[in-house]
Amino acid sequence: MRAIELPELTQWCTSLGTSLGACAEAWQGFGEWMSSGNGINVGGLTEFFHREQHEYLLQSAQWCQLRQTEVIGDEFSLVEFDMASTTIDELKACSADFKSVISEDAELNAFGGWFDTDFRGSEADPAPQPVTLTTQPESTTHWAQQVFMVHPPMNVQVGDTLEGTVKCARQRLNHRLMWVQLTLTLNRAGVGQVGPERTLNYRID
């Protein structure tokens, strides 16, 4: 997983923010129509509607094909599984601390996630020539990456350090889907912590 800056995603975030506003306007119009035409007040649902739209547009992981030029921080590994010995219980949830040093002055507006698969054989029958297949940005694969948007974005500088914890767990109703929580702080040399600690929650649907 890496910190990334996406020029397109900046536009995308703007578009999503605009979409959020458009949804709010559409809901208001719907409410007025329901009230005047049907005598029904849907105002009690407004908070739930806004929350649902915010979660869908800004707190759901998005499929994206990233470029290496959009990566602005060190890669960090969240978890490793030995598929020959991993149990189902071990797959239910995982947690990892991370640290990523920023490599350029930029706007951090997302984290990118992907996976690698190492074919090493086993202890009893090791592969004569281990092979790693990666789904990192611009790799030769049909897979793309997951993008976890940071909203509002963070201004970062060369040498800044992002530190925190990533927690992943299966969703209750569908175990193929995941909940992801990312807690992070931004630290700058000679300054210390910049801004408050942030906790970001996402769904991978």
Regions found by a protein language model. Give the residues of each.
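Class I SAM-binding transferase module
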Residues: 1-167, 171-205
